[in-house]
A protein has these predicted regions:
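N-terminal regulatory/effector-sensing and dimerization cores
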Residues: 2-3, 9-109
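Short, Lys/Arg-enriched N-terminal segment that forms or immediately precedes the first helix
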Residues: 31, 152-157, 203-206
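Short, conserved glycine- and acidic-residue-centered signature motifs
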Residues: 42, 162, 214
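Conserved coupling/switch loops of ABC nucleotide-binding domains, chiefly the family-specific signature
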Residues: 51, 258-260
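An amphipathic alpha-helical interaction segment
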Residues: 93, 97-104, 113-180, 184, ...
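Terminal helix-turn-helix DNA-binding modules in bacterial transcription factors
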Residues: 171, 175, 180, 184, ...
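The DNA-contacting recognition helix of HTH DNA-binding domains
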Residues: 194-195, 199, 244-245
Length: 265
């Protein structure tokens, strides 16, 4: 068991960007087998898996992750990785303790935000896009984007305390993720007044119905794009978009990348 220093990971570092404000963005890739024992990292970090995958083990759970998966690691938290697929590639957002204090955030808040996976994934992709832009505004922009992570946690807390119909609505929307339901359709299924959904949806979901459905669709598309098994037109139709151009516009709006740019990451 050993502890990795700041901005160090078991894989090869392909790109690293330090804002000098408490955030480091590190892109890592795994081409060959690496150390599979217990280890930890100095700083807390969020990892978005872009390609490949691995079996992630902690003291209390084991999980197989792949493209589009999102995990949070507390500072000094012991974990190990086994059965890594090659090649694998990850984006790691590493957070200094001092920045958490400045933003009045805790590791627990960040861990909670990861449960709102689509919103947090898209923030990470936008942060990574800023590292590729890498101009005089990028460091401040990355800090501003990261500070939004608390929004995901706030809406999760409201969601957990919500009426029963809200959870039923979430399940329904995720079940029909590749469809385009309207308020009347949803209200009929849930035996509600459409105004009830319209009035309370932003409070519990943190956005409009249309925005939520776009997030679900684009979130589902991430693994489809990285699998290279379908072209963009097929993916657009599979995810319920009217055409490829609509899909491309929505994908860029949510992630900061064009689909083909994301595919090449």
């Amino acid at each position: 068991m050993y502890e990795l220093e700041k901005e160090k990971y078991l894989g090869n570092t392909k790109k690293s960007f330090n804002t000098q404000q408490g955030i480091a963005v590190v892109e890592t890739e795994y081409q060959n087998k690496v150390y599979e024992g217990w280890h930890s990292h100095n700083n807390a970090h969020i990892t978005l898996f872009l390609k490949g995958g691995t079996t992630e083990k902690r003291k209390n759970f084991s999980e197989t992750v792949g493209p589009g998966s999102l995990l949070f690691y507390h500072s000094d938290e012991l974990h190990l990785n086994q059965n890594t697929l090659f090649p694998s590639r990850n984006i790691n957002i590493e957070i200094e303790e001092n920045l958490l204090k400045d933003l009045q955030l805790s590791e627990a808040v960040i861990e909670k935000s990861v449960q709102n996976s689509a919103f947090t994934k898209f923030l990470i992709l936008k942060i990574f896009k800023e590292t590729l832009t890498s101009d005089t505004f990028s460091a401040d922009t990355i800090t501003m984007l990261f500070s939004q992570i608390s929004n995901a946690q706030n809406h999760l807390e409201r969601f957990e305390k919500s009426p029963f119909w809200v959870k039923s609505l979430q399940e329904l929307l995720n079940d029909c993720w590749n469809e385009n339901p309207n308020l009347q359709d949803l209200a009929t299924v849930l035996n509600l007044n459409p105004i009830t959904i319209s009035k309370h949806f932003p409070k519990y979901f943190g956005c409009t119905l249309g925005e939520y459905m776009r997030r679900i669709k684009i979130n589902r598309s991430l693994s489809l794009i990285q699998s290279h098994e379908s072209n963009l037109t097929q993916i657009a139709l599979e995810c319920g978009f009217a055409d490829q151009s609509h899909f491309i516009r929505t994908f860029k709006s949510q992630t900061g990348f064009l689909p083909k740019q994301f595919q090449k990451l």
